[in-house]
Every structure is written in C-alpha cells, then in structure tokens.
Amino acid sequence: MKIKLVVVGKLKEKYLKDGIAEYVKRMGTMLPLEIIELADEKIPDNASEKEAEALKKREGEKILSRIQAGDQLAILAIQGKLMSSEEVADFVKKAEVYGTGNLVFVIGGSLGLSKEVYQRSDLQISFGRMTLPHQLMRLVLVEQIYRAQMINRGSAYHK
C-alpha cells in the first residue's frame, strides 16, 4: 500500500516545501507518500455560482481520475469529522491491514470539492472550522500522516 496526497494547486512557498520534504523523507522507510499536484482552474473575477460549480466539477474530474477503484479516499472538508491523531492513526492502520488499494487524501482548491468527490469519499476529515491556506494545510496533513505512522509503530514521536 502507498499513501497518496492529491492536491489542487502548486506549492509556492519554500518554507512549506522544505517542511513537507522533511516529513516525506522520514516516511520513506515506512509507508511511502506520493504527492500529486493538479493544476487549479482559474477563477474569473465575479464568477457566478454556476461558473464556480463548473470549475469545481472540472477539478473534481481531475481528482477522481487519480483515484483507483480499490483506493480508500479521505477528503479534507470543514464539515467533516473532527479526529484525534490517534483516530487518524487507526484509520491509516486499518487501510494498511484491510485495504485493497492505496490510501488517498485529497485537499481541494479554493472553491472546495465537487459533489462527485464527496460522494466517492470514504471519510471526510475536518481540522476544525477555521479557514487555513490550502498550502499550509498540506504541511499540517503531511505531519499528521507521519504522526499516524509513528503512533502505529509505537514511536515516542507522539506524546
């Protein structure tokens, strides 16, 4: 099994790239993490609701094209389930033991995720009701994936 992180948009800030690279390097000997960046759709100024939905749908199609039939899909959603690090670790462990494909986490674009992505998801995770930059959320999620692996291996990293 592999863990994949599918994200909409490019990571620009070097400090975030460096932080993510450090956790990816640490995970190299455990469950490897593959990050897949998808181009975001350009949002016109004053886009109508219909235009915004069409853009989300196109981004959703790109996301779903990266998901295989046996993959478990966890999406980040403000209205998703609040989970402790231990609960995330349990989810990762169950995917590793019982899953038939890869474990895929998704961070959508600035408009959110399409209803098709929501419908395909196996789990919707919330990190709280605060709005955070998607690029920063990427680092937070990668750290939590690393932490989950450390918890599952009984490491002292998680205290």
Curated annotation (Swiss-Prot):
Subcellular location field: Cytoplasm
GO cellular component: cytoplasm
Keyword Amino-acid biosynthesis: no
Binding site for S-adenosyl-L-methionine: 75, 108, 127-132
EC category: transferase
Entry keyword set: Cytoplasm, Methyltransferase, rRNA processing, S-adenosyl-L-methionine, Transferase
InterPro entries, alphabetized: Alpha/beta_knot_MTases (IPR029028), RlmH-like (IPR003742), tRNA_m1G_MTases_N (IPR029026)
Alphabetized GO MF terms: rRNA (pseudouridine-N3-)-methyltransferase activity
Any Pfam family hit: SPOUT_MTase
Key word Transferase present: yes
EC number(s) given by UniProt: 2.1.1.177
Swiss-Prot/TrEMBL catalytic activity: pseudouridine(1915) in 23S rRNA + S-adenosyl-L-methionine = N(3)-methylpseudouridine(1915) in 23S rRNA + S-adenosyl-L-homocysteine + H(+)
UniProt function note: Specifically methylates the pseudouridine at position 1915 (m3Psi1915) in 23S rRNA.
NCBIfam families tied to this protein: PRK00103.1-3, tRNA_RlmH_YbeA
HAMAP family from the UniProt entry: 23SrRNA_methyltr_H
Subunit comment: Homodimer.
Similarity-based family: Belongs to the RNA methyltransferase RlmH family.
Entry protein name: Ribosomal RNA large subunit methyltransferase H
